[in-house]
Structures are given as C-alpha cells and as structure tokens.
C-alpha cells in the first residue's frame, strides 16, 4: 500500500463567525396536507401493481366527478420499486385515500411529511476531518491527511441532497449529473449538497480524492418531502444495480426527520439489493431511533464528534443511541460550496459527519474486496478506533479510521 500525504491549506471562508453549537430544537412531524405514501404488501407482482394503479386512477376520476377532488389533490405522482419494496406517493382527497387504505394489496398508508438537511451552524475553525480519520490518536504535531494512493479510484459516492456545484475546480470533473427530481437547473443553489460532496470526494477536502461523485438532487432548499427522498433512493439503487456497481458504491444521505416507516423500509430494501447506505444521525441531541432514516437498522448511521481540548467528544447536537454505528468529525468542517468554481464554506452538523464515512467506504472499496454492504460495514467497523469518544450515550464508541497506520 502506497501512502500519500495531504496537508490541507485553509482558504478564506464565506461565512460568519460563530462560537457555540446549540442543539437544534427537535422537529415535530410536519405533515404535507393531502399527500400520502402508500406501501404495497410484500410479494406483490408487477401485474397487480399495474392493476392497482389503474384502479386508483378510476377511483380518483369518480371522485373528481363527484366534486371531492380539487387541484390540490391530483392523484398518483410517483412510483417506487426498490428490490422487494414497492410503493407510490400522491395527493388524494379523503374519500379516495380511505378506499386505497382498504385495498387488499395495501400494507400501509402514511402521510407524506417533511425531512430536512442536517447542517447545524457555520463556524470559522480549522478543518480537521480527513486528518482525524487517518490517525488513531488526535494529531497534535502532524497536520497531514495520510491516505492510500488509490484514494477511491473506480468507486462512486451518490450524494442525495440539494445538488452539487459540479463545476467546482476541486471536483476535477469527477462530479457528474445523476438525477434531478425538480424542474429547475441541475445545480446547487442552497450549498448543503456541494459541501457534503466535497467532504466525500473533493481534491482538497475529501476523503476519497479520486472517487466519482454522483449528483442526486432531491431538494432545492433545506427541506422537502420524504417522497422526494424516496424517489432519489429509488433512482440511485436502479443506477447502481443496473451498472453493477454494488461493490464500488455508497449512497450518502445527510437528511433527517421524524421517523417515517416507508423511508426506513426503502433503505432496508436498498441494502438488501446490495447498496451501502450511509446516513446522518440528526442534530436534535436526542435518541437517533426517533429519526429517519437514521433509525433504519440496515443503514450505517453516523454521529458527529469534535476534538477540542485534546479529546474526542460527541457533539452536543449529535443524535445518539443504539442506532448510531460510528462517528466522524462534524464540527468546523471546511469544504466546497455553491456560487463559484472555488467557493468554500465552514459548516457543522451530522450532515458533515456522514459524507466522511460515505467517502471512507468508497476509499476502502478501492483498496479491498468488499462485495456487499455487509462486507463494507464489517471492514469499516473493524478498522474504526474504539473507546476514544466521550459522552456517546449508548452509541457505538467507534471513530472512523482509514487504516493508514498512523
């Protein structure tokens, strides 16, 4: 293994100075009026799905004629098929949704609700993320990131977020368009997605410096419907399995909200299809089991740490508990940003911790034979530094490490 050394040079950030990291107020479920996610029972075949959707259209048409349906409830909008998970979402009037709920092929009907990106606050501190995960101990005299020369080459990280500033020089042309679920420019006008993408795989700030970064634009702002996130995951799984990339890909989701079982089931199906899914634990300072997709047992749920005062400590905002499999740096992280070809920003949150781990998985996939999510998870946790983090509150006391030997 040939180790490379990278010393981060800090550039001017575009964000104001903050000195504290308050816990985000835990979000209550924010239901989107008249929008629902309908999950089919396991084992349903395609013919039955097509028959059901035709039936839904007929029910909707009948209720439109009766005056029950309005412009706000146009009917079926999006279909999902991830491995053995089949579902759809749409806007339905009360009469139509009650008929759907009673259909023998329907497992569950859930209101569609909001999920949010999980950055917390911006702060002008020196970035330390890649440096920390290439050292067993907190580096005091070594400001370098040590990494294998393969550096994620041939691997893919799918960033499900607000889009990516793909023209940024630090991506070196490796950030490519995947899918845009909105009728807007395929770019990032929010900044969160570009920042996460840079942590995973940019030249200066990234963990997997040679990986391909795939832009899966699910939100245009800091929040959106679960059904949009499910649509992005549906596309990602189909793309990964269609290109036979299961052993060379990770999906990174730095989005969180109150528990949504359909979203958790979609993650479960993605992993069963052979796709590794990494998610942020959330910034509520509470048990991650109360959030999705962090509560999905099949996901690799990531908490945030800081390394102030000479010790690694769980960030006060970071969700915790048995759902959290591993931690990574998440405070004062400098990375790529929106707006120009060289924009940077300094941000904090479990949103920043998760792409460290997604990038690390892509990095490890380029070095080791990791054919499926179980193997990727096993290698990640096998390498992780144990029992160094203060105040884990029931989370796994594991800190991401790239195996550099430093």
Swiss-Prot record:
EC number: 3.4.21.-
Residues forming the catalytic site: 161, 192, 351
A biological-process GO annotation: proteolysis
InterPro entries on file: PCSK9_ProteinaseK-like (IPR034193), Peptidase_S8/S53_dom (IPR000209), Peptidase_S8/S53_dom_sf (IPR036852), Peptidase_S8_Asp-AS (IPR023827), Peptidase_S8_His-AS (IPR022398), Peptidase_S8_Ser-AS (IPR023828), Peptidase_S8_subtilisin-like (IPR050131), Peptidase_S8_subtilisin-rel (IPR015500)
Pfam families found in the cross-reference section: Inhibitor_I9, Peptidase_S8
Record propeptide residues: 21-118
Entry keywords, A to Z: Glycoprotein, Hydrolase, Protease, Secreted, Serine protease, Signal, Virulence, Zymogen
GO MF, one annotated term: serine-type endopeptidase activity
Location of this chain's protein in the cell: Secreted
Keyword Methyltransferase: no
Functional summary from the UniProt entry: Secreted subtilisin-like serine protease with keratinolytic activity that contributes to pathogenicity.
Name the UniProt record assigns to this protein: Subtilisin-like protease CPC735_023170
